[in-house]
C-alpha cells in the first residue's frame, strides 16, 4: 500500500533532531500551578520571540540571521500559544505572520509543514486572511505545481482545511484550476489524487459556480471527475472521490452522475457479496477489510450516493433521474442481492463488539436504501424481521438506529413493512416502550407506533400510549408525555370510528394533570373545533365534561374546554343539570383556575345568563366581586359584562345578549395545528384520514368517521379550502396500466389531439427548436438539446408557454403522457419539472422542461403527448399536442464525429454487406412521397436546386451525405441510430428525387425489424404535409 511518512513525525523532526525548545516551553506551561504563572511565562516568550523576529528583519544581504530551525521553533510556539489560550491571544501573535509565510517558502519539509499547519489554525480569522492572503496564494500555487509530492501534499492539505473557512480560495480560479489539474493528471500519484479530490470538494462547497458558470468547463471537469471511478477496484481513490461525486449529484447536476450506476453497483457488489463470501474464489484484499467486513466505509458512501441517484417507486416528482424501471435488470438484481446479504450478515452472531457494530452499520444503510429498489413483499418482510431482532440489543445506539430504520422502512415501503411490524412484532415494541429508560429510544418507539397506526389498530395503540402516560413507572419527562399526548390526539381524530370512544379518549387526554403532561392548548382547542363542527358530538361531550367538573380536581385543559363548550351548548343538557348548578360548578372551579381559564369562565357565566335569566342575581354578584380582582383583564371583563346585563334589563329584552353572543359558527381552519408538532415524522399508515393537510385537502373529500360511525350524523373536521394542484402527476401512477391492441396505454389512445398539432409535430422532427403550437390563446415553443454527447439517446426538452391574450392565464398545469409505461417501454419520461408559474400575465411566459430516454426503436407516431390545462377569460381549456421524438433524433452529425463520414466505395460495400446478411428483413422502401408546399416549386427549377433542398433537409435531421457525382438524382445517406438498452444501429439510405417532384426512399439498417420503417416515416413526415 502507498505509504507516506506521517505529518506528526515530520513536524517534530529536522535532520532527525527534535525541537527541544518547543518541548521545554510546552512542559513549562503544563507544569504551571496558577493561571498567573502560565500567563507570565507566555508573555515572556512572546516578548522573546518578537525580539528575534525584529532582529531577523535587519538581516544584511542574503544572510538569514534567524535560520530555518529557529524560525520553525518560534512559529510553533506561537501556534501553541494560540491553541492553549483558546484563540484569545490572536492579536498578540499576529506579528509572527510574516515569519510564518517565510516558512512556506522553505525547501525543507518540516519547516514548510509548520508554516502550513499554523496558517490552517489562523485562517478562520478574517484579519489573518487580510494580511497574508496574497502571499499565501502565490506560494500555494508554487507548491501545487511543485515536482515534490510532499510539497504538493502540504498545499492540498491546506486547501482542504481552509477551503471551507474562507471563500477567497474557492473564488481564486488559479487555485481551483491547480487543484483540478492534480486531480485529473495521469501522472499524479494515487495519494495526491485522493487529497486533491477532497480539496476540490472543499472548494466546491464554498463556491458552486466553479462547475456551474462555464458549461464547457462543467461538462469537461465533471466527466474527468467521474472517470476516476472507472477503476472499480481502486478502493483508496474511490473512497476519496465518492464524496465529491455525491456533492455534484446532490447540488450541481445529477444527470451527469447517472452513468455511474454500473460502476457503483459493481463496487457495492464486490464489497458486500463477493467480499463476504466464504468461497475460495474470494480474493478481496485483506488490507481493505475491517472487522471481517470488506471496506465498510466505502459501502456506506456508495449506498449514500446511490440513494441520491435512484428514486424509490413511491417517490413522486422526484429530482432523481433513475427509476427502477430505468435500471437494467442485471444491475437491479445485484443491488437487491447486496441487501439480502447485508440482512444475513446483520443476523449473524458476532463475538467481537466492533464486528457487530460494523455489521449493523452496513445493515442499516442498505435496508434504508432497499426501498429504492422496488423490493418484493418477502424481501421487505425479511428486512423487518432482521431489524426487529436487533431491538433486544443491549446497546442504546443499535436500538435507536433500528427503530429509525423501521420508521423509514414503514413510511417508504408501505403496507408490506407495516404489516410485518404490527402483526409479528407489536408486543415486542410495546414491551420496549414500557421498559426503556432512554428518552431518545422512547421517542423513536412512539414515532414507529404512530407511523403504522390505522383504523384497524388505532384503539390498541392509543390505549397502549395512554397506559404509558398514566403509568408512574415510566419516564417522568413532561415533554415526552406531552408529545405522546399530541400524537394520541391526532390518531384519534384521524381514525376514530366510534364517536363515544373519540370523546372518551379526547377528554381523558385533557384530564391529565400537569404532573403527567404539559397542558397543551392545541389539544383542547382542536377538540373544541371538532365538537363545534359536529352536532352529533355536542350533547355527549357536554355530558362528559360535566362529569369531569363534578370531580374535586379538574385539569386546566378540562376547565377551558368545559367553559367554551358548555357556554355554547348548555341548553342541550338541561334535563341532566340546570344552568344554576352549572354556574355553581364553574364558581367552585373559578378560584383554583389560572387567569386565562378565569376569563373564559366569566364569558361562560354570561352565556348561561343569556339562556337562563333566572340566575341573573348570582351572575351579577359574581361579576361585582371580580371588579376588585388584581388582574386587569378580569376587572375589565367583569365590568363590561355587568354593563351588558344592565343594558339588557333597561331595554327589557335580551336582544343585545343574543347579538353579542351568537352561536359559534363552524370552524374553517386551514390545517391541524397539532400536525406542526410532528416535525419531519412521516404520515401514519392509514390511507383515509379525518384530517387533511392543505396540500391533500379537497372540498369533496369525505371524512373517515362519517363513513364508519354508527350514528347517522358524522364528525365534520374543520376542512381547509380546496387547493389547486399545479404539479405534473407521476407518469407511472397516473396512466392506466391497461393497454389496447397496439400495445399503447389506453389512456394515451383516448387523448384527442388539437386540430393543428401535426404542423408543430413535423417541425419538431427536423428542427431542434421552434414553434410547437399556436392558437388565439397560447403559443408554445420547444427546444431539444442533448445534455451529454456520450448519451445521445437522452434528450432535454424545454418548453415555453406564451400568453397571447390580454387576460391572465391561470391554473396552468401539464401532463406528459407516454405511449407505454408497462412491459418494457420503448422510452422513458424523466426529470419532469413543473411549469415555472401557474399564472401567466398578458404576453408573459412560463417555462418547463423534462427529459426523454430512448431505450429501443419505436414509431415516431407513438411520441409522448403533452397535455396542457389552463383557464383563460373564464373558460377552461385543454390542448393536447404530440411532441415528436423519433429515431432520427438520436443521430449525431459527422460534423461532431468526423469518423462517421463515408465515401462512396464504403457506402456501396456496406450496402452490399447488409443485403447479403439480412436480405429484405432490415430494409424498407417508400415510393411516391409527395413533397409539401415548400417543395412544390421544385418542379419549375433545376434538378440541382431540388436536390440541394433535399440535402439541406436530410442533413438537418442529422444524416451524413456521401459525396458522389455518379448518380445525380440520388442522395446516398448514412447515420447511426442510438438507443440505451439495445445499443446502436447503422443506417444506410438511398433517396431518389423524381422529375415529377416525388421522392423514393430505400432504407437499410443493421438489425432486422421495423427500425428502417421508423426512420423512413420520420423522413416522410418532414417531406410531406
Swiss-Prot record:
Any one GO BP annotation for this protein: intracellular protein transport
Topology of the protein relative to the lipid bilayer: Peripheral membrane protein
Phosphoprotein keyword on record: yes
Domain of life: Eukaryota
Region (Disordered) residue spans: 713-737
Location of Phosphoserine modifications: 733
Database matches in InterPro entries: Adaptor_Complx_Large_Subunit, AP2_complex_asu, ARM-like, ARM-type_fold, Clathrin/coatomer_adapt-like_N, Clathrin_a/b/g-adaptin_app_Ig, Clathrin_app_Ig-like_sf, Coatomer/calthrin_app_sub_C
Localization annotation: Cell membrane; Membrane, Coated pit
Keyword Lipid metabolism annotated: no
Subunit comment: Adaptor protein complex 2 (AP-2) is a heterotetramer composed of two large adaptins (alpha-type subunit APL3 and beta-type subunit APL1), a medium chain (mu-type subunit APM4) and a small adaptin (sigma-type subunit APS2).
Extra remark beyond the main annotation: Present with 1590 molecules/cell in log phase SD medium.
Role of this protein: Adaptins are components of the adaptor complexes which link clathrin to receptors in coated vesicles. Clathrin-associated protein complexes are believed to interact with the cytoplasmic tails of membrane proteins, leading to their selection and concentration. Alpha adaptin is a subunit of the plasma membrane adaptor. Facilitates interaction between APL1 and APS2.
Alphabetized PANTHER family for the sequence: ADAPTIN, ALPHA/GAMMA/EPSILON
Family: Belongs to the adaptor complexes large subunit family.
Protein name in the entry: AP-2 complex subunit alpha
Source species of the chain: Saccharomyces cerevisiae (strain ATCC 204508 / S288c)
